[in-house]
């Protein structure tokens, strides 16, 4: 952990009587029981049988070839190749650990990401998105955002995404280069009226619908 790294760097071995680092907690810790097992499965290239329960659907059972663990917004996700049976093609999926209801070892040969998805660099799978939702039929595009001056100072020092760049000839404007997805919408709506999406029009249209829906819930109440 980073605490162990700091202790090693500063040669510290001190029995603390009070906390000196505070981590943002997460009330939903059910997924923790699977973290270590999946981490070892990735290192050892071992398949798992995962019972996965989407919020609005029945349990699905996958043969999983685990490739990568990712944390986003206080949730853990597994990027893996999945099969419904040993005879079906491998499909890439991102599964939230807190929707896993059961997991077993399974004696199925592990198929590496390089073999299953030769055109995909798994380490870069999430590179062009915010969050974990990637849609192969959606293009990566520029997102132009105008910020209030005060919010611009905050966003310029705490980027929304690694692709974020300032626009030299447009004060208080930034540019992202990402794929549109639900997490992008969530992240931008977080800033409320402190920002305006200038481009693309598709996001402006989406936000207009969201805001109209919000207004209908609060209007005359």
Describe the predicted segments one by one.
Residues 1-53:
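Bulky hydrophobic/aromatic content
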Residues 33, 59-65, 140, 171:
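Short beta-strand-initiation
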Residues 39-86, 91-93:
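Loop-centered beta-sheet repeat module
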Residues 84-123:
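Flexible linker/loop signature enriched in Pro/Ser/Thr and Pro/Gly
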């Amino acid at each position: 952990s980073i605490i162990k790294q700091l202790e090693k760097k500063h040669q510290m071995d001190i029995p603390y009587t009070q906390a000196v680092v505070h981590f943002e907690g997460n009330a939903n810790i059910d997924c923790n029981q699977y973290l270590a097992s999946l981490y070892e499965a990735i290192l050892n290239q071992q398949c798992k049988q995962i019972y996965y329960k989407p919020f609005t659907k029945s349990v699905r059972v996958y043969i999983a070839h685990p490739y990568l663990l990712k944390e986003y917004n206080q949730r853990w996700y597994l990027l893996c190749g999945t099969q419904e049976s040993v005879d079906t093609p491998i499909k890439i999926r991102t599964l939230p650990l807190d929707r896993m209801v059961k997991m077993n070892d399974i004696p199925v040969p592990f198929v590496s990401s390089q073999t299953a998805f030769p055109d995909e660099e798994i380490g870069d799978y999430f590179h062009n998105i915010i969050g974990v939702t990637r849609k192969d039929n959606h293009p990566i595009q520029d997102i132009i955002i105008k910020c209030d001056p005060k919010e611009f100072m905050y966003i310029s020092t705490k980027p929304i995404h690694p692709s974020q760049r300032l626009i030299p000839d447009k004060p208080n404007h930034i540019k992202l280069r990402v794929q549109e997805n639900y997490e992008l919408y969530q992240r931008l709506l977080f800033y409320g009226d402190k920002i305006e999406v200038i481009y693309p029009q598709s996001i402006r249209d989406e936000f207009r619908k969201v805001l109209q829906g919000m207004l209908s819930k609060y209007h005359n109440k």
